[in-house]
Amino acid sequence: WAENGFRQVTNSKREIPTPEDVKGLRLRVVGSPIFIDTFRQLGADPVNMNWGDAVTAFQQGVVDGQENPVGVLVPVQIWQYHKYSTFWNYLVDPVIFYWNKKQWNTFPKDIQKIIREAAQEAGRFEIALCRAGLDGDKSLNILKNEFNHVMEVPEPVKFMESKGMTVTFLSDKGRQAFIDATKPLYEKWVPKIGEDLYKNALSDRGK
């Protein structure tokens, strides 16, 4: 597996150090029901729209903010629309490699091994790419030493701040406040997702 990075929230109104600060904000979110439920639980007004419509809504002041990983925030130059960004790591975007089992079984074992190793390598590269500059030098060194890749923006937070954004990081206590505020969602969604899958996801968290 790989990932697109941890999703952060940006907006044009205020910093968001506590769950109470989310209340009343109109935010563009992914159309998945669990995303919408999360922001409604926090008191926001989540809106599902494509990115082109979202940019127009930001410019017109119809929508206050959005949520996306840093790997999206920098390329779209989010500072053109929003002054505030809160790094709360509320969700990580997993990228899972799938293959048709029937077709997979037609490959010789040595080809399966090559494909599997290539997928693992691609996943390691993607994870490092999305975490670069956010975990000290760890991911930057992986990219440089293993893949001969140098990031154009090696320190995304400082880069965003240089563009005039205020970037807020949550303390452990602050992050726990958001966890507590969204606990009712666990009761709703864990049975739907499956207890085993939920526990496996928790055990893989941070790897």
Where do the language-model regions lie?
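N-terminal secretory/targeting leader peptides
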Residues: W1-K207
